[in-house]
């Protein structure tokens, strides 16, 4: 999936144009690329290991995954993929890839809120409702600790 929605468009679009960019931002892109890949692959591994499934619709996790990166944010795999695209836009100084990255943010948000979250709500019911109440969709709540720690402090297991 990463190849279809991340690598192929980035490689193709990166050759269309370039824009002026301070060198420091190109280096930021060099950090975002591997960081995004690491987050994406780690998130996928947690789906396999702790969810006993994958990110593919044909083999979804059998258990709600609330460990690893999912302690801090509900969609770390998507965040990792988007970081790869933004990193590539900065590295290649590509306006087309930057526009693609912004478009993918919008598409991903709409997909998650309109399609994925209702399915997760039906599949995991109360566990998912508790998880949603303690863990943000896109931005981690660093100052308050993890979803698990907050739930344990309140006496509510996830």
Question: Predicted regions span which residues?
Answer:
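Solvent-exposed interhelical
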Residues: 70
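Extended, alpha-helix-rich binding/interface surfaces that flank or overlap catalytic cores
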Residues: 75
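Membrane-anchoring alpha-helices and their flanking helix-loop junctions
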Residues: 1-67, 79-158
């Amino acid at each position: 999936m990463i190849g279809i929605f991340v690598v192929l468009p980035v490689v193709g679009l990166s050759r269309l144009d370039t824009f002026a960019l301070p060198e420091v931002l190109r280096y930021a892109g060099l950090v975002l690329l591997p960081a995004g890949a690491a987050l994406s692959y780690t998130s996928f591994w947690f789906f396999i290991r702790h969810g006993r499934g994958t990110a593919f619709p044909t083999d979804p996790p059998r258990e709600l995954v609330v460990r690893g990166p999912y302690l801090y944010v509900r969609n770390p795999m998507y965040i990792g993929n988007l970081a790869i695209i933004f990193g590539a836009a900065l590295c290649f100084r590509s306006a087309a890839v930057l526009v693609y990255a912004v478009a993918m943010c919008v598409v991903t948000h709409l997909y998650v809120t309109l399609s994925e979250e209702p399915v997760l709500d039906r599949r995991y019911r109360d566990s998912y409702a508790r998880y949603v109440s303690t863990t943000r969709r896109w931005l981690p709540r660093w100052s308050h600790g993890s979803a698990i720690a907050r739930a344990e402090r309140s006496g509510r297991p996830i």
